[in-house]
Each structure stands twice: as structure tokens, then as C-alpha cells.
Amino acid sequence: MLIVALTGGIGSGKSHVAKYFHQLGSYVFDADQLARIAIERGSKGFDEVVTTFGDQILKDGDIDRRKLGEIIFSDPTAKLKLEAIVHPEVQRLFEEAKKDLPMDAIVIYEIPLLAESNSRNRFDYAITVESDVETRTSRLKERGLASHEIVGRMAAQASREDRVSHCDLVIENNGDEDALLRKVEEIWQSVLLPLSKTHGK
């Protein structure tokens, strides 16, 4: 089994790249999605988050992710507290899911905070998707984020240089979908498939 970390700054296009890898035959997991599951109502994580941050983060009985996001992206201490609750549970969920996969699987693990979480050693290979700030900002505005939210979230993440230093390969993604797909296909054929042959034993 080959476990590949896929990282990149917010708005870089990680999810597009993950989708293309899935179409080519990989199994894709999203750390953010696992993090949502980890704090769903009824979970241990939910109780810990509400105890830590108070009822102000609740909306109709569920955690308001936008409100929680505003808190953690403006307060580094709050961010660390949340990560201490969520990260171990995310790792547990991922390990459980891996048990059901074939031994020759290529697993793409979409993890925005690879550099920040110091978790590079959990992966066989790491790829970062990078875009210029203007392109990322434009994409995030299309998602409905306000300018101050975009600036705050970008500032809270590792720099491009830091992400690149943790990775084996960089995918530049500044707009052209066809070019991006061709890059992903090339990486699949020339890098990941050969690597999987040595990790699938």
C-alpha cells in the first residue's frame, strides 16, 4: 500500500487534484472531512470541543464550523487546543478505514496542514499543489469567503517554502484545467504506479 500526502495552501486546488487521482484509480481520503466526522454531534470530539470553546460555537445543536473557524484562525492558542482534540481522532478514523483497502492500493490523503502538523513521516510520498496568491484569492472569493477571512486563513497556514520543503513533488496550478489533468496523469504513470509496486508487497 502506497500512502501519499497531498497538501497545499487554501485555494490551491488540492481537491481538484485529489479528484483526478481518484478517477485514475486511487483511494482518496480528506483530512478535513475526517475532522468533520470527528466532531459530529454525539461523538467524543463534539463534547470536548463544546467544553473547550463553549456554547457560542453551536448553531441548532451542531458545531457552527464557520464560527469555530473564525475563532481558531484569529487565535493561535485556540487553534492548538482544537488540533489536540481533533488530530488524534482523525488519525484513528484513517487507520480504521485503511484496514478495508487492498494491499496494492494507492491512497491519496488530502491534508492541508502537512507541514504544520509535522506528520510527513506517516507518508511514503508527499505532493504539494501550489498557486499564486492572486489565483487562490480569486477562487476563495468564489467560495464566498470575505477578504479578511482569506488573509487570515492564508496567514495561519505554512508558507509555500515550508510546504515545498516537506514534499517530494510540486504541482503548479494557476488555472488551466487541462494542463492540471495532464500533470496529474503524468505523475500517476511515472511516479505513483512505479512506487506502488515496491510498497504493495
What residue spans do the PLM features occupy?
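Small-molecule kinase domains that catalyze NTP-dependent phosphoryl transfer to phosphate-bearing small molecules
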Residues: 93, 120-122, 141-192, 200
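ATP-dependent NMP and nucleoside kinases share a basic, alpha-helical "lid"
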Residues: 93-101, 106-142
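ATP-binding Walker
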Residues: 12
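P-loop (Walker A) phosphate-binding loop of NTP-binding proteins
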Residues: 9, 21
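Hydrophobic anchor at the beta1->P-loop junction of P-loop NTPases
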Residues: 6
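ATP-dependent small-molecule kinase phosphotransfer cores
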Residues: 33-105
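Walker A/P-loop
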Residues: 15
